[in-house]
Amino acid sequence: MKKIKISVIGSTGYAGKELVKILMNHQKVELVHLVSSSYAGKNIAEIFPEFLNKLDKKLINFNLDVVSQDSDLVFTALPHTVSMDMVPELLKKGVKVVDLSADYRIKDFAVYQEWYKKELNQISKELLLEAVYGLPEIYLDKIKDALLVANPGCYPTSVILGIAPLLKHHFVEPVGIIIDSKSGISGAGRKLSLGLHFAECNENFKAYKVVRHNHIPEVEQELSSVYFGADNKEQIKGIKVSFTPHLLPINRGILSTCYLSLRGSKKEEEVLEIYQKYYHKAPFVRIFEPPNLPEIKYAVGTNYCDIGFTIDERVGKIKVISAIDNLLKGAAGQAVQNMNIMSGFPETCGLV
């Protein structure tokens, strides 16, 4: 059986490590190069002892010619604004890319500059429009033919999947949407930070970036596209959301609670039906029937997005609860799901 050759750039971050764990056991993948500027020259098992006797692979510095020549597809799991200088060169060499940063998620380069504070060259502006947003449950057909996939953020994945069916079917008002999300500490990455020290996080629960989180424009862009249609000029006005992230004293997992105003009276059976129909071909979405609701512990360690809801008739609201593993469906698992689709493999290959 012929395998596709894969390299991972940024293989020693949390998402990069999860990619390696999945890919080393993927039956259709040959893991060629693991790139890490911080640990080049060391064996990955020296950095993560869990790979001892499982994977014998030396970490290397990035070399465009070496990586592109040996790879069919490359994952870039790098900090935001870093991938944008590297991805165009890989694409020029004929290599497909799944980028886990935010660098190619935002279609409007002015919005990208506003939120990420990076100037764009002309090539990058063009790639913003060419990149496919890698949410398979919505963009499956586009991902199949994509050369560059922008892997969604963790919070946006939980939110967009959670409420897309309601917006698509106009069951809710596109205004006044409130999103309350909680994430485990790994969502902040491996970099050192006082606020992420054990003594700061343990036995604590706090909100952060309560007005301006970088995932807001991504969520608004995709919800607007779902509601108004990708080609509808009305989406320029756009859906606005009030988003508040929180940090949980756990390693991984996200739980999002979204509050939306119903358009008229809706029964649970009606809402359940649109969710089941919308995701009936989505292998990694699990719909909970009321009164059951998702919990983080059900989703952690899987590539599933679990979705449940409750209708508060007294105030005319629907509350949607979704849960994912931020490092899997929110990062590495979804990236491999996209790789599978781009390569013509079953979506679930290597993930179940």
Model-flagged regions — what are they?
Residues K42-I44, D70-S71, A188-G189, N251-L255, ...:
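Short, solvent-exposed polar/charged micro-motifs at secondary-structure junctions
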Residues M1-N204, Y208-V210, D231-I236, T310-E313:
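N-terminal Rossmann-like NAD(P) cofactor-binding subdomain of oxidoreductases
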Residues A131, I239, N303-C305:
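Short beta-strand or tight-loop elements
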Residues A207-V211, L248-P249, I296-A299:
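Short Gly/Pro-enriched turn/cap motifs at secondary-structure boundaries
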Residues N25, S225, I341-F345:
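Short, well-ordered loop/turn and helix-capping segments at boundaries between secondary-structure elements
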Residues Y14, E130, C154-L161, V210-E218, ...:
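Conserved active-site and cofactor/substrate-binding residues in soluble primary-metabolism enzymes
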Residues S256-V352:
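C-terminal active-site/capping subdomain that shapes the small-molecule cofactor and substrate pocket
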Residues V211-E289:
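C-terminal substrate-binding/catalytic lobe of Rossmann-fold NAD(P)-dependent dehydrogenases
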